Design a protein with these regions (language model features):
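P-loop/Walker A phosphate-binding loop and immediately adjacent motor/lid segment at beta-alpha junctions
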Residues: 201-230
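Short hydrophobic/aromatic beta-strand immediately N-terminal to the Walker A/P-loop
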Residues: 35-38, 64, 99
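A short, well-structured beta->alpha microelement
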Residues: 22, 77-92
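Short, glycine/polar-rich helix-capping loops at beta-to-alpha or helix-loop-helix junctions
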Residues: 72-75, 85, 174-181
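Conserved P-loop NTPase motor module
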Residues: 1-24, 31, 35-36, 139, ...
């Protein structure tokens, strides 16, 4: 069967607004989109996937939400009953968002095959969101259906471009949780708050040119990410997906924290006149640090940033 060379025309002019500079998808037209969100639980990874699904569904994609917790039906309607129902819905394209309940890799496999079959047959834009990615893809484990599920997800990643199939998947860590194929092919990365310093050795190469350090990741709050895209690296605060807004509890305002890292102090000092910075001698710094109840690490980072800023201005 002859096919025309696929052209991702839906990418041209499409955008993602994730809380920072809008990401234009024109530059992804030749590669497709493979997004990975990395961070511990409660970091906002699921919301990121739902936000992207809502935005892409409004721009011509059909989004398929793989839900291992059976929570998303209350937000987006009843889940499809079986793989055949998913096939039919993807072929008709009359529902912008479809929910698939799959509690483990074994349950995911027939739905994954259905997605691949429809993508290969019709080649119309589909966006798959896989929450709790470690349940369906593992770096080593192959038992209990994970091997077959991982192979299907790898095919999403490796052949998705030619089938108009785009992917978002979550990971708890940068190593040891997902097949390396996904990290090798990713082109949009969201890295959230990190508490484990041993994870930094794997993450550090991502930030080599941006001077971002582990302390910067450790200072992130839920919903904040460093976004690595074709446009570079940007710190963003992810908006809440529309469906979540209706059910999310009202958050209490959090008092603004003082800078904790060299980069945060440096950014804060950029806006302070030179004469005021020059007046911050050792005694003044000690007094202000005591009043603000700064930690020793905050004081050291602030002193280093102050010295660097003054040297830069002279």
């Amino acid at each position: 069967m002859k096919r025309n060379v696929i052209r991702r025309n839906e990418m041209l002019g499409a955008t993602l607004e994730l809380g920072g500079t809008p990401i234009t998808l024109d530059e992804y037209a030749t590669t497709g989109l493979l997004a990975v969100a990395i961070g511990p639980r409660g970091n906002g990874k699921t919301n990121a996937g739902l936000l992207m699904a809502e935005q892409l569904s409004a721009q011509g994609w059909v989004s398929v939400l793989i839900d291992p917790e059976a929570e998303l039906e209350s937000l987006y309607g009843d889940a499809v009953a079986d793989p055949e129902m998913l096939r039919n819905a993807l072929a008709k394209r009359d529902q912008p968002i479809l929910v698939v309940n799959a509690t483990d890799a074994g349950e995911f496999v027939p739905y994954g095959r259905a997605i691949l079959d429809v993508a290969d047959q019709y080649r119309k834009p589909i966006f798959v969101v896989i929450d709790e990615g470690q349940l369906f893809s593992a770096s080593r484990k192959r038992s209990n259906g994970i091997g077959e599920a991982a192979d299907i997800i790898n095919e999403f990643a490796e052949r998705g471009r030619k089938h108009a199939l785009d992917l978002f998947i979550t990971a708890l860590r940068y190593t040891g949780t997902l097949q390396r194929t996904l990290f090798a092919n990713k082109n949009l990365t969201l890295i959230g708050w990190q508490e484990d310093p041993t994870a930094w050795s794997a993450l550090a190469p991502q930030f080599k040119a941006s001077k971002i350090e582990f302390a910067d990741l450790n200072a992130l709050t839920p919903g904040q990410f460093f976004c690595l895209s074709r446009h570079g690296v940007e710190k963003i605060r992810m908006p809440m997906a529309e469906a979540l807004k209706a059910v999310a509890p009202k958050a209490k305002p959090v008092a603004k924290a003082l800078p904790a890292t060299f980069n945060e102090w440096s950014r804060a000092m950029e806006r302070i006149p030179t004469e005021r910075l020059a007046a911050l001698d050792e005694d003044v710094v000690k007094l202000l640090s005591a009043v603000a109840e700064l930690s020793a690490q905050q004081v050291l980072a602030g002193q280093a940033a102050l010295q660097d800023e003054l040297e830069t201005r002279t």
